[in-house]
């Protein structure tokens, strides 16, 4: 409205699966202890109230965007969302740079999730969750079009039911 735009978006996709995600509470991951590499080593992973609220909001309305402050624990929330979709398929998490790939991978591993990465020289397939960069996806798309890849973008996205974008503004 501030810029005189009126946008109407309609979702015309025909879903074959009805998603019924189990909501989280603060103790959803309390059976998992933080590892030695985490400042809270040896204590249970517990979600904060606002994290529970945000995660459950995404689970109720999976096609949404939320602005979440720095330091709010976005990566643990992302891992929680990925864990909740596991019964339906794979998740892809897109981050803007390699350091966020490795940080996100570490947090997923802390949550005992089956995680692989796709960027640079590390191209790991066959995992329930994949962390990648925009650049890696763009290269994969370009190479798919040029038929110069071992795996196509279509094969890469097979069984993906959730795409989570971190730092979407970048």
Task: Give the label of every model feature segment.
Residues 72-111, 135:
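Conserved Walker A/P-loop ATP-binding site and its immediately adjacent core
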Residues 120-130:
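Conserved motor-coupling elements within RecA-like helicase/translocase cores
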Residues 46, 50, 60-85:
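Walker A/P-loop
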Residues 1-49:
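Helicase-associated low-complexity/disordered flanking segments
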Residues 66, 93, 130-132, 163:
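Hydrophobic positions in the central parallel beta-sheet of the AAA+
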Residues 60-61, 87-88, 125-127, 157-160:
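Short loop/turn elements that form and flank the Walker-type P-loop nucleotide-binding site
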């Amino acid at each position: 409205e501030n810029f005189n735009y009126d946008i109407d978006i309609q979702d015309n996709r025909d879903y074959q699966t009805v998603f019924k995600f189990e909501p989280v509470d603060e103790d959803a991951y309390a059976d998992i202890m933080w590892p030695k590499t985490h400042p809270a080593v040896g204590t249970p992973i517990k979600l904060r109230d606002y994290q529970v609220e945000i995660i459950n909001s995404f689970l109720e309305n999976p096609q949404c965007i939320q602005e979440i402050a720095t330091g709010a624990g976005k990566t643990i929330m992302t891992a929680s969302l990925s864990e909740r979709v596991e019964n339906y398929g794979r998740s892809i998490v897109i981050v803007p740079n390699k350091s966020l790939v490795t940080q996100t991978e570490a947090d997923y591993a802390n949550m005992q999730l089956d995680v692989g990465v796709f960027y640079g020289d590390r191209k790991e397939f066959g995992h329930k969750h994949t962390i990648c960069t925009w650049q890696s996806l763009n290269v994969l798309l370009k190479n798919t079009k040029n038929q110069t890849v071992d795996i196509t973008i279509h094969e890469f996205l097979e069984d993906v039911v959730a795409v989570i974008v971190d730092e979407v503004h970048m």
